[in-house]
Structures are given as C-alpha cells and as structure tokens.
UniProtKB/Swiss-Prot annotation:
<dbReference type="InterPro" id="IPR003451">
    <property type="entry name" value="LytB/IspH"/>
</dbReference>
<feature type="binding site">
    <location>
        <position position="279"/>
    </location>
    <ligand>
        <name>(2E)-4-hydroxy-3-methylbut-2-enyl diphosphate</name>
    </ligand>
</feature>
<keyword id="KW-0411">Iron-sulfur</keyword>
<feature type="active site" description="Proton donor">
    <location>
        <position position="140"/>
    </location>
</feature>
<feature type="binding site">
    <location>
        <position position="279"/>
    </location>
    <ligand>
        <name>dimethylallyl diphosphate</name>
    </ligand>
</feature>
<comment type="function">
    <text>Catalyzes the conversion of 1-hydroxy-2-methyl-2-(E)-butenyl 4-diphosphate (HMBPP) into a mixture of isopentenyl diphosphate (IPP) and dimethylallyl diphosphate (DMAPP). Acts in the terminal step of the DOXP/MEP pathway for isoprenoid precursor biosynthesis.</text>
</comment>
<dbReference type="GO" id="GO:0051745">
    <property type="term" value="F:4-hydroxy-3-methylbut-2-enyl diphosphate reductase activity"/>
</dbReference>
<dbReference type="GO" id="GO:0050992">
    <property type="term" value="P:dimethylallyl diphosphate biosynthetic process"/>
</dbReference>
<feature type="binding site">
    <location>
        <position position="55"/>
    </location>
    <ligand>
        <name>isopentenyl diphosphate</name>
    </ligand>
</feature>
<feature type="binding site">
    <location>
        <position position="24"/>
    </location>
    <ligand>
        <name>[4Fe-4S] cluster</name>
    </ligand>
</feature>
<dbReference type="GO" id="GO:0046872">
    <property type="term" value="F:metal ion binding"/>
</dbReference>
<keyword id="KW-0414">Isoprene biosynthesis</keyword>
<keyword id="KW-0560">Oxidoreductase</keyword>
<feature type="binding site">
    <location>
        <position position="55"/>
    </location>
    <ligand>
        <name>dimethylallyl diphosphate</name>
    </ligand>
</feature>
<feature type="binding site">
    <location>
        <position position="138"/>
    </location>
    <ligand>
        <name>(2E)-4-hydroxy-3-methylbut-2-enyl diphosphate</name>
    </ligand>
</feature>
<feature type="binding site">
    <location>
        <position position="237"/>
    </location>
    <ligand>
        <name>(2E)-4-hydroxy-3-methylbut-2-enyl diphosphate</name>
    </ligand>
</feature>
<feature type="binding site">
    <location>
        <position position="208"/>
    </location>
    <ligand>
        <name>[4Fe-4S] cluster</name>
    </ligand>
</feature>
Length: 328
C-alpha cells in the first residue's frame, strides 16, 4: 500500500512514540521459552507449539524459520517431541490429551492468565456460577472456560447481561479476559453489580498491568497527534483495543508492518503517533520510523506515562540451562 507516490523530504513531521509499548512480560517470557527450547533440544527433539505462541505474524514466521512447527491440535505432534502451550493458555482437556501422549510439555501460559484460571477453579470449587467477561472464540477465553467442567457464562457486552440465566444470585462470580478495554469492562462490571449486588469478582484486577498501561498511554497519545499507527496483528485482542481507543480521538490504523501505510494519508499530517500491541516486537516500530524517514523529515519524541519493570521467570529446566550457557 505504501507505494503510493508521496515523498516530500522538506516536510517535517513529529513522530511521538508511546512508552510503554510492545512486548509485555508474559509475551517476552513465552518467546524466550520457545527460543531456549530450540537451543536446549537442538538436534534431539522436534518442537511444536500449540496455536500461535503469541498473536503476532512476524514472531510466528520468525520462529518457523528457526524450526518450530505450529499446530492446532495435540494429535498433530509426533511422539517423543516437545509441545509448548501458547501464552494464551489451554483448557484442562487439552492438558489431559497431552498427558496421554509421549510428549514433553512446556507451559508458556502467561502467569497473569494462570491467575485467572485459578480464580475460576476456586469459584467453581466453592459452588459459584462463573461469568467470564471476554470475547468468544479468543484463545485465552477458550482456555479459561475449559478450566472447569461446569458451564461458564461468557459476557461480551452489556446486552449479554440481560440474557443471563442465574441459578442463585448469591452464588455468582465473575472474572475477565486479561486483554480487554479497561473502560468497556468497567461499564460491564458496573451493570453486573447493579443487577446482581452480591456478585463476587476482582474488579479490574484481572486485566493485566501491560494492557492497562498501553491503553492509558494510547489514549493520551491520540489526544496529541493527527494519526496513530498501532503495530499489531488483526487477531490480537489487545492491539484491537488500542486501535479502538485511539480512534475515539483521531485517525487510527492497526498495521502488521510499515508496508500497510498509505502515504496519501499523511499529506496534511504534522504529528504521527506510534505504539504497539503487547505481542508486537519493537523492530516493527523501528521499521515504520525508517520508512517515514525515507519520505519526510522526522523529529522523534517520546510519550512516557508509566515505567514497567515486571518480568516473569521461564520454567526451571530452561532457566537452569539459560544460567549455565547464556550467562547475562
């Protein structure tokens, strides 16, 4: 799309980069797990990943070139191989299927998603009917619903609340997908609490820190610029939320790479905002900057709302290997 003819090297634009942006701790951990597994099992075992390790085309294609095989079903993995669960988590039934096979399983589920899984299990064990606020069909939602055998009610919007059939309003609890819009989720929670005053739940604590930070920064960024580009894949929930939030204030486009930028959109633009979803590597942001510099004068600046320092450890076996062979 970018091959539209537009180049004005005299035109100066300010490009404001959102901070934080891109990889969250859960995504960084999942990708590190796969890369360490490639080294650890080199020439000894085939490595399969169940579903996309994270929802980003660039990352998936890069890992494929390193020998990783992405599959949709456990039975596609050969006996004696390694199977890695994606950052979005999997259902208990999938884990049970894997246990029946001769597979070495590594769980790359984000610890914050695992936290929601434990909440669902605890509520169910205590006799509560569970509502999950999230998007039907999303891998994370499928994994969370699959933590218990009791049916989980999925609420995607306010209208869904009116259709809920409850057994006992005093034994009702909710959890949320970790990558939702904070603002939209708060409205849904408020309506649930109004309709079911005794409902239990974590408020907005299930929505991960990185999702909240990126949304807060993106909202502010959109107020300052004429257009926002969000680096992220179309199937990335958190990236789509960033596009929606930025779009409230200004033009917003979710792109996989600089190749999707239509330069004609920038004719009358003086300020461009750039951010990235939690699964998007920063190399994609740098490529956008380099591309813009080929067509106009670029003045770079940062918008930093909050600093992040969260990290998650990889599984012990890989951590020991890393410490032994990849000393920092």
């Amino acid at each position: 799309m970018h091959n539209a003819i537009y180049t004005d090297l005299q035109k100066e634009v300010e490009v404001i980069l959102a901070r934080p942006r891109g990889f969250c701790a859960g995504v960084s951990r999942a990708i590190e797990i796969v890369k360490l597994a490639i080294e650890y099992y080199k020439d000894t075992k085939t490595i399969y990943v169940l579903h996309e390790i994270v929802h980003n085309k660039y990352i998936v294609e890069t890992l494929k070139t390193m020998g990783v095989i992405f599959i949709d079903k456990v039975d596609q993995a050969q006996d004696g191989s390694v199977l890695i669960y994606s950052a979005h988590g999997v259902s208990k039934s999938i884990k049970q299927l894997a246990e029946l096979r001769d597979l070495e399983v590594i769980d790359a589920t984000c610890p914050l998603v695992n936290k929601v899984h434990k909440e669902v299990q605890l509520y169910d064990k205590s006799g509560y009917q569970v509502i999950l606020i999230g998007h039907k069909g999303h891998r994370e939602v499928e994994g969370t619903v699959g933590q218990i055998s009791t049916p989980v009610i999925i609420v995607q919007n306010l209208n869904d609340i009116d259709k809920i059939e409850i057994f006992d309003p005093d034994k009702l609890a909710y959890v949320t997908q970790t990558t939702l819009s904070v603002d939209d989720t708060k409205v849904i929670i408020d309506k649930l609490k109004k309709k079911f005053p005794n409902i239990k739940g974590p408020d907005l604590k299930d929505i991960c820190y990185a999702t909240q930070n990126r949304q807060t920064t993106t909202k502010r960024l959109a107020e300052l610029v004429d257009i926002v580009f969000i680096l992220g894949s179309k199937n990335s929930s958190n990236s789509n939320r960033l596009k929606e939030l930025a779009g409230i204030q200004t033009q917003a486009f979710l792109i996989d790479s600089y190749k999707e930028i239509d330069l004609n959109l920038l004719n009358d633009i003086t300020k461009i905002g750039i951010t990235a979803g939690a699964s998007a590597p920063d190399i994609l942001v740098q490529q956008v900057i380099d591309f813009l510099k080929q067509h106009m004068k670029v003045k770079l600046s940062d918008l930093e709302i909050v600093q992040e320092s969260v990290t998650f450890n990889v599984p012990r076996q890989l951590r020991q290997y890393k410490e032994q062979y990849n000393p920092i």
